[in-house]
């Protein structure tokens, strides 16, 4: 760069003018910042949030106690106990997930042959105590009942890829 060019850039502050023009350009664009608890951004249909156990339309729980989710969980966060019913089918008597161990990988959801355990759209489940993050079967079924419409819609959208 010649001395004349350097002097011209310094004298006319071309770098400063370029920076200010960029700032003005962004100043008049649409804002992308959200005012988070009052505004919420879109979630991907593949978002993996709080776990839930689903039920059939009849109200019967879907889980058949195959224990595939427990076996595949890399964090060993799932504990299942089951017993056979009179009709020969198996159902869970205990289904616990330690959410402090869970790494939200989604392997349990992928392994489940009947779509019983899913990771729902809820990401706001902060608690004050550790015990509140130890989910039992009842808590998981409540989550499933609460988020069933969104979970079913997300699973239907992803059916081609499963």
Swiss-Prot record:
Gene3D superfamilies: 3.30.70.3270. InterPro entries: 4Fe4S_Fe-S-bd (IPR017896), 4Fe4S_Fe_S_CS (IPR017900), NADH_quinone_OxRdtase_chainI (IPR010226). GO terms for cellular component: membrane; mitochondrion. PROSITE patterns: 4FE4S_FER_1 (PS00198), 4FE4S_FER_2 (PS51379). This is NADH-ubiquinone oxidoreductase subunit 8. Its EC number is 7.1.1.2. Residues 54-83, 93-122 form the 4Fe-4S ferredoxin-type domain. It comes from the Eukaryota. [4Fe-4S] cluster 2 binds at residues 73, 102, 105, 108. Binds 2 [4Fe-4S] clusters per subunit. GO terms for biological process: mitochondrial electron transport, NADH to ubiquinone; mitochondrial respiratory chain complex I assembly. It is found in: Mitochondrion. It catalyses: a ubiquinone + NADH + 5 H(+)(in) = a ubiquinol + NAD(+) + 4 H(+)(out). Belongs to the complex I 23 kDa subunit family. NCBIfam families: NuoI, PRK05888.1-4, PRK05888.1-5. Its cofactor is [4Fe-4S] cluster. Keywords: 4Fe-4S, Electron transport, Iron, Iron-sulfur, Metal-binding, Mitochondrion, NAD, Oxidoreductase, Repeat, Respiratory chain, Translocase, Transport, Ubiquinone. GO terms for molecular function: 4 iron, 4 sulfur cluster binding; metal ion binding; NADH dehydrogenase (ubiquinone) activity. [4Fe-4S] cluster 1 binds at residues 63, 66, 69, 112. It is an enzyme of class 7 (translocase). Core subunit of the mitochondrial membrane respiratory chain NADH dehydrogenase (Complex I) that is believed to belong to the minimal assembly required for catalysis. Complex I functions in the transfer of electrons from NADH to the respiratory chain. The immediate electron acceptor for the enzyme is believed to be ubiquinone. May donate electrons to ubiquinone.
């Amino acid at each position: 760069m010649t001395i004349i060019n350097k002097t011209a850039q310094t004298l006319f502050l071309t770098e400063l003018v370029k920076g200010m023009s960029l700032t003005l350009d962004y100043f008049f664009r649409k804002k992308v910042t959200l005012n988070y608890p009052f505004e919420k951004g879109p979630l991907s249909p593949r978002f993996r949030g709080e776990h839930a156990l689903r039920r059939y339309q009849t109200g019967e729980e879907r889980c058949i106690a195959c224990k595939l989710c427990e076996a595949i969980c890399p964090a060993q966060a799932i504990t299942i106990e089951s017993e056979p019913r009179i009709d020969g089918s198996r159902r869970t008597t205990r289904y616990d997930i330690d959410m402090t161990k869970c790494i939200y990988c989604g392997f349990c959801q992928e392994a489940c042959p009947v779509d019983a355990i899913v990771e729902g759209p809820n990401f706001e489940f902060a608690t004050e105590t550790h015990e509140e993050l130890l989910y039992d079967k009842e808590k998981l079924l409540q989550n499933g009942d609460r988020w069933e419409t969104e979970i079913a819609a997300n699973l239907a959208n992803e059916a081609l890829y499963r």
